[in-house]
């Protein structure tokens, strides 16, 4: 069947997959709901016409992210940039290629169900960087699971530019596997955790300073008055003052981060669907772990450490529900795929040992 790339049923489902860009922008919601789409489409159109980036002085901190995303998506073989939805077809294309590659390892009937998660259908149907982040993250995690040394580093470079926070969490997994032999035994993982804890304690002031910068920025962005609306007392109340406070806040808020929006917070049908999906995703992760008996695997433990680090960090700075539902999916989806791939990898290793 793999000589045909995909089977007939999958082919039919992908017809729907490629049509979904026509269902969201201007149909289910105003494209300004995901306003960053305009940055990527305008930049990609300019790059195609002039082979040089636009001046993005007005978007401090966005320049490199926008330009690199637009270069990659804008030069894929898709039709001309005729609307804000145009780059969505590039996102669909890279995820089709991703599916074909993954189907070599993961059964198609399981994989296609994962590709029909509502959030994946949504984000690949828009002109966003999110699918590109997930694309690079998945290849990074899988190549690291294969214990390749150079390819993951090459994939990490664009991630550092496009989404540096996620690149940080992913790099933890690379360090665990390559430098602490996290694929062989749990001993290296314990050593890594002890060293990491010691470094955080040693540089706790700098660590808390960085976390508070992100925490305050997202809190102010979500406030009615925006930036500049907080007085000194409000800023102090939001700031985390100690490592103990950081861990208490991250652990207690992690449930909110993983399950937001709760059904009673749903302002519309879209939020209600995301609330249900969050439960499905958590259930799916536990199902894969249990059915694949991954809890015996040091590689799984290494994956889990990097994932938990990402969840805890985001939990501390999560204020805007819409923004962090999006961040959560982009963080979790590559790990779901990696867990599925690891099941295949462990089964293959078991069969090899039995021969």
Name these PLM-found stretches.
Residues 74-75, 86-107, 283-287:
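Transmembrane-helix motifs of polytopic, lipid-linked glycan transferases
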Residues 25-41, 163, 169-292:
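Alpha-helical transmembrane segments and terminal signal-anchor/GPI-anchor hydrophobic tails
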Residues 125-132:
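Short acidic/glycine- and proline-prone juxtamembrane loop motifs at membrane-interface regions
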Residues 95-96, 111-120:
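Transmembrane and membrane-interface helices of multi-pass
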Residues 107, 146, 285-306:
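Membrane-interface helix-loop-helix junctions at transmembrane boundaries of multi-pass membrane enzymes
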Residues 36-82, 252-253, 257-258:
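Short hydrophobic/aromatic helix or loop-helix immediately within or flanking a transmembrane segment
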Residues 1-22:
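Start-transfer (signal-anchor) and selected internal transmembrane alpha helices
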Residues 106-108, 138-151:
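Membrane-interface transmembrane helices that cradle and orient dolichyl/undecaprenyl
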